[in-house]
């Protein structure tokens, strides 16, 4: 199954889960490598099934653990890094983190002495705790970066993925540690299958955030100009609000900055000084647009649905609109429409 998933990611050009999404190529390649390593992992643990000597079995397990530390664990961490697209993180730290374990395993195999194993388990526990702390901080930082740069967050947020992956990896950790008995062996097999399908889904539904279709600069401005807060506010009113540019799907802060003739840094500073984010600014405009459409439709006694009005207000996903509406208005769409009728 792992090998099939690897071949699928390497050679299939189109997405099966989300055909309209272009996933990060870096994430796709490293996930394919991870599946290839999982497939090979069955081979380097195979001798333990035929060996009878306890010492030989222990040596075989140590060799398998060494290969996992060289490949499986670092590549799994790299996949997590590749999901975060706010910056291009270096990929060598996961390999460096595993060096003490690798050295310890080599020493154990050479000396046929396993006294270092308890210390290595303690190191792995601290390493796992440190990685969790780092990833929680990075995911929170990534969420802020998304809200500062993108109006639409569909196929961009990743925090749910880390919760699911953390649960799956915890099950694997319990199994590898020897706790849990035979029941966990069957559970881990199920988790392994779920991990394959979940990673495939995650890779194919995560939108790459590289700029591919930039908007042209506003005529006559050329390079970005330093502007005051009042000037930026006027330009936003003129080139975003009046033109209803906020209705454009996947409008990024860089797109908007080019449209008004400044750069993203000045525009981000503007939103920061207004104690808001770019995402909140665009969502507020879209919700105001929805309210206007609703009032026009009710006044003219036209038939409509909330889903259609949300789509006309710039939202691809009704669930995203519902969440933004509740955050802005303090109540659900249904409750607001009932009170406004």
Give the ranges of each region predicted by the language model:
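Hydrophobic alpha-helical transmembrane segments and immediately flanking/interface helices
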Residues: 55-75, 183-204
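Alpha-helical transmembrane segments and their immediate juxtamembrane interface regions
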Residues: 74-90, 195-214
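N-terminal low-complexity or simple alpha-helical regulatory segments
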Residues: 1-106, 110-111, 116-122
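A cytosolic-side transmembrane-helix exit/cap motif
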Residues: 113-117, 140-147, 203-216
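Membrane-proximal linker segments that couple transmembrane helices to downstream signaling/catalytic modules
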Residues: 201-316, 320, 324-327, 331-341
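Alpha-helical transmembrane segments of multi-pass integral membrane proteins
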Residues: 19-40, 97, 120-197
């Amino acid at each position: 199954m792992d090998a099939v998933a690897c071949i699928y990611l390497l050679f299939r050009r189109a997405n099966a889960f989300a055909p309209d999404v272009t996933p990060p190529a870096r994430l796709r390649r490293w996930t394919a490598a991870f599946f290839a390593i999982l497939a090979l992992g069955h081979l380097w643990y195979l001798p333990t099934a035929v060996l009878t000597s306890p010492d030989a079995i222990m040596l075989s397990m140590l060799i398998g653990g060494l290969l996992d530390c060289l490949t499986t664990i670092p590549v799994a961490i790299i996949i997590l890094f590749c999901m975060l697209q706010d910056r291009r993180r270096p990929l060598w730290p996961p390999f460096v983190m595993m060096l003490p374990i690798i050295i310890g395993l080599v020493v154990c195999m050479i000396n046929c002495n396993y006294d270092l194993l308890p210390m290595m388990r303690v190191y792995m526990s601290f390493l796992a705790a440190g990685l969790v702390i780092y990833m929680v901080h990075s995911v929170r930082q990534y969420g802020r970066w998304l809200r500062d740069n993108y109006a639409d967050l569909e196929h961009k947020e990743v925090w749910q993925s880390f919760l699911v992956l953390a649960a799956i990896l915890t099950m694997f950790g319990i199994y590898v540690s020897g706790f849990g008995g035979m029941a966990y062996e069957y559970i881990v097999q199920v988790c392994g299958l779920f991990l394959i399908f979940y990673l495939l889904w995650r890779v194919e539904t995560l939108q790459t955030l590289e700029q591919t279709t930039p908007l042209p600069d506003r005529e006559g401005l050329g390079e970005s100009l330093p502007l005051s807060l009042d000037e930026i506010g006027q330009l936003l009113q003129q080139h975003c609000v009046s033109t209803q540019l906020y209705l454009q799907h996947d409008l990024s802060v860089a797109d908007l900055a080019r449209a008004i003739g400044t750069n993203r840094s000045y525009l981000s500073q503007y939103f920061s000084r207004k104690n808001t984010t770019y995402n909140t600014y665009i969502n507020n405009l879209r919700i105001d647009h929805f309210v206007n459409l609703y009032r026009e439709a009710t006044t003219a006694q036209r038939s409509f649905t909330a889903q259609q009005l949300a789509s006309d207000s710039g939202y691809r996903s009704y669930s995203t609109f519902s969440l933004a509406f509740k955050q802005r208005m303090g109540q659900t769409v249904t409750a607001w429409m009932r009170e406004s009728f």
